Amino acid sequence: MRILIVEDEYVSRRFLYKFMKEYGECDVTVNGKEAIEAFIISLEDENPYDLILLDIMMPEIDGMKVLKTIRLMERDRGIIGHERVKIIMTTALNESENVMEAFDEGCEAYAAKPLDTKKLISVMEKLNLI
């Protein structure tokens, strides 16, 4: 499984990397701009990500805008349904409006920080990633 971790906060980024590397090849970006660039490169190389763990509050471009941009790029390239990358939003913002907006924009799951690894495993199983 190819995984992109998008997290600006060092401790969270390191935690996610150490945990997720057991499930696949992980790339890490520290802001939304880098995330979009990494996603484009993965498509151009015909080696797309299977999963993106995407923080909402980040510098450059926030996670909601990254989510919207990725879904638009997929749509424009004819990537639909189960072929789309699975996106799990990871954030300390657990307000219902943020959760609803993320689902409206096309994320598959929403994980509040601090992350519970057992719940994350369960979500990945439900998404047929593991």
List the predicted regions and their residue ranges.
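Conserved acidic carboxylate
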Residues: E7
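Helix N-cap/capping motif at the beta->alpha junctions
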Residues: Y10, V28-I41, G63
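Two-component/phosphorelay signaling modules centered on CheY-like receiver
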Residues: Y10-V28
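Short amphipathic alpha-helix used as the core "switch/output" element in two-component signaling
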Residues: E37, M64-H82
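C-terminal output helix
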Residues: L115-M124
